[in-house]
Regions:
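N-terminal secretory signal peptides that target proteins for export/translocation
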Residues: 1-26
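Non-catalytic accessory regions flanking glycosidase/transglycosidase catalytic cores in CAZymes
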Residues: 2-3, 23-253, 282-305, 310-513
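Substrate-binding/catalytic cleft of secreted carbohydrate-active enzymes
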Residues: 230-233, 257-285
């Protein structure tokens, strides 16, 4: 299909270099980890209740798969004078002026080992590339009353592009770059643009990138051009139409954005975050999106391109504290993984890093008899045998004490009970002790990573791991993220308003290979 007709929808897509191929569906996992966005916005209330229960993990089959680089972060285009609700939180963190030589920045990125970085955001459709026969001067973004998002066109010098790619190579990141989809088009009215896309500037930019040997994993076309459409917020009709019109093997990925908390200034932010029913609303989006992809574009996959929780730079004193275990921007705004001025990691950096290191691609089924305020998710462990469980306690007053069970052993216990009536209780207790491991005389342990805010203050800027505050070392390195080893036979205790990663190295899960 000709470029002009394919892109006439003015929507967002991602194309990866080489032969088109489907990717693992990140959206499938976003349903699970998207609920890991925040724990609370109010002071800690010490446990008043203790609730006992069970978590059952089914390791016999895969229910979904994520991409290898599920965790990703954005380097945005917003200039320092981008302001929302009387605050200007972006500072000098733009693609064009971020201090790439800051030692904290490189070390924070390298700790992920192949972090996906998206270069893009709202202003990407105003960016010109200073290469080839550019017909206008290459000026930085400036405030402009009638401009898109209140700014003029901006420009990326190739010297800066060279610097960025040196940084990408040195830190081992995987790059997704968002192209300007409005070049050559004209504004018809407030949110409507007409005319054909002029691909000449993008083509010159691509040629330059290839000539320099820079490896860009994927190219994204446009950003929220139509609001509720691909590259923006999910709307079934738009997604179906694009897949039907483009046809087989044209689009590798359909991306959409998630800001299910609403505006960062919303006074109801707290109640939304602590309400499991509100968090569950995301499941409808993912369910519908799954249906659309399977029926109309099974060659494609879906990515959540942005998921900052609250839009318009996030919530001040919320998105940059312990309560925000979501991520979107690498640095800048209130929802960055790193502080915009000191480059020191915000609390959610560490929860994202632990996810990246511990949770593998294969998603397993989990069932729990606990209240909806305890959220449980299981994956095959990353790079090792066993299963890793993520547990989030959204309750501000209940301590959950949970036995973790393997569905395989439960089935064995039921079969044994059928053969020997009257011994079921004893058999079940015996089953609970092994959590899916093969019988052994040696002491067995699990690894636990409990995340809490410093001094119990949920809007703290310091994350605490197993009672130890996480802070840069004197040499400016990321601190060690060490687990505590707990006897496998003991139940798991999840304190109010906390997050825990639990690794079971010997969990028997055929789906994990």
């Amino acid at each position: 299909m000709p470029v002009s007709s394919l892109f006439s929808f003015g929507v967002n897509l991602i194309h990866r270099g080489g032969r088109a191929r489907p990717l693992q569906s990140i959206y499938r996992m976003e349903l699970r980890f998207g609920l890991f966005l925040s724990v609370a916005l109010i002071p800690v209330i010490f446990a008043q209740d203790i609730s006992h229960g069970s978590i059952v993990v089914d390791g016999t089959m895969t229910v979904a798969q994520t991409d290898d680089n599920f965790v990703c972060a954005t380097i945005d285009w917003w200039p320092h004078d981008k302001c929302d609700y009387g605050q200007c939180p972006w500072h000098y963190t733009s693609v064009t002026n971020l201090n790439l030589s800051h030692p904290f920045l490189a070390k924070a990125v390298q700790a992920f080992n192949n972090l996906r970085i998206r270069v893009g955001g709202s202003l990407q459709d105003q960016v010109q590339y200073d290469v080839g026969n550019l017909k206008s001067p290459c000026h930085p973004f400036e405030k402009m009353k009638d401009g898109l998002f209140g700014f003029s066109k901006g420009c990326l010098h190739m010297e800066r592009w060279d610097e960025l790619n040196r940084f990408f190579k040195e830190t081992g990141v995987m790059v997704t770059f968002g192209l300007n989809a409005l070049h050559g088009r004209h504004k018809v009215k407030r949110s409507l643009w007409g005319g054909d896309w002029d691909s000449s500037n993008a083509q010159e930019f691509l040629k330059y990138t290839i000539s320099k040997g820079y490896h860009i994993d994927s190219w994204e076309f446009g950003n929220e051009l139509s609001g509720h459409a691909p590259g923006g917020f999910f709307e079934e009709e738009w997604f179906v139409k694009l897949l039907q019109t483009s046809g087989s093997r044209v689009l590798d990925v359909m991306s959409h954005h998630m800001y299910n908390l609403g505006a960062g200034v919303d006074p109801k932010l707290i109640s939304k975050i602590l309400n499991p029913d509100h968090l569950n609303k995301a499941s409808y989006t993912f369910g519908n999106l799954t249906h659309v992809i399977r029926r109309h574009g099974p060659w494609s996959s879906a990515w959540v391109g942005e998921s900052g929780g609250a839009y318009n730079s996030g919530g001040a004193h919320v998105s940059n504290t312990f309560v925000n275990s979501f991520w979107q921007t690498l640095i800048g705004g209130n929802y960055g993984l790193l502080n915009a001025t000191t480059f020191v990691p915000n609390p959610d950096y560490y929860s994202a890093l632990l996810w990246h290191r511990l949770m593998g691609k294969v998603v397993l089924s989990v069932e729990s008899d606990a209240s909806p305020f305890l959220r449980s998710y299981a994956h095959c462990s990353k790079g090792r045998a066993g299963v890793t469980l993520l547990v989030i306690n959204l309750s501000n007053q209940t301590n959950f004490v949970m036995n973790v069970q393997n569905s395989i052993n439960l089935k064995l216990a039921v079969n044994e009970q059928n053969m020997n009536q009257g011994g079921f209780t004893h058999t079940l207790k015996k089953t609970f002790s092994w959590v899916g491991t093969k019988a052994s005389n040696e002491a067995l342990f699990r690894e636990e990573y409990h995340l809490t805010p410093k001094d119990g203050y949920l809007q703290s800027r310091t994350m605490v791991l197993n009672g130890i505050p996480l802070e840069f070392t004197d040499a400016g390195n990321i601190p060690s993220l060490d687990p505590v080893h707990v006897n496998l036979k003991s139940p798991i205790s999840i304190s109010p308003l906390s997050i825990a990663f639990i690794v079971f190295p010997n969990f028997k899960a055929p789906a994990c290979g």
